[in-house]
Amino acid sequence: MRPVFYHRHAVRYLRRMPADRKAQVKAAVGGIAALEDPLSHANVKALGGEWSGCLRLRVGRYRAIFHLLMDEGDECLEVLQIGPRGDVY
């Protein structure tokens, strides 16, 4: 399983979310981190344009934008943004 890091923007939004939704998003991100290939998950899609190189995870009406990083030889998952569909892009 890859370690998961949250950018300060994602942490700020997580603090304001209802507790049940926060747990749902964190569980979904943890599930993606455990996968060998995140794109094999049905709710993950590669993004283009401004977010080129990033992936999107759909969790109900929320979206989490993340990318994979190499950290001292190990791959980790960094969550950049979390929010409702209309605001996160």
Task: Show where each model-derived region lies.
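Enriched for short, Lys/Arg-rich terminal
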Residues: M1, R8, R15-R16, A23, ...
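N-terminal alpha-helical segment
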Residues: Y6-H7, S40
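Short strand-loop junctions, especially beta-strand C-caps/beta-turns
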Residues: H9-V11, E50
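Alpha-helix boundary/capping and short turn/kink residues
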Residues: A19-K22, D37
